[in-house]
Swiss-Prot record:
Gene Ontology MF terms: structural constituent of ribosome
InterPro entries, alphabetized: Ribosomal_bL33 (IPR001705), Ribosomal_bL33_sf (IPR038584), Ribosomal_zn-bd (IPR011332)
A Gene Ontology term for the protein's cellular component: cytoplasm
Family designation: Belongs to the bacterial ribosomal protein bL33 family.
Record organism: Lactococcus lactis subsp. cremoris (strain MG1363)
Disulphide bonds in the chain: none
Keywords recorded for this protein, A-Z: Ribonucleoprotein, Ribosomal protein
GO biological process: translation
Protein name (record): Large ribosomal subunit protein bL33C
Pfam families: Ribosomal_L33 (PF00471)
SUPFAM superfamilies cross-referenced by the UniProt entry: Zn-binding ribosomal proteins (SSF57829)
Amino acid sequence: MLRKAGLACTVCGSRNYTLNLSSVAKEKRVEVKKFCRTCGKHTLHKETR
């Protein structure tokens, strides 16, 4: 079973990406360094629910 999760920028707080994650692997939230269109640079994005 998959669950939808959004990725929010830690700098500006905008939600830029969505992921389909396995509901089994739910230990901790995902943190990925991705490009933020609002900030205009690569920043850390954390999972939101």
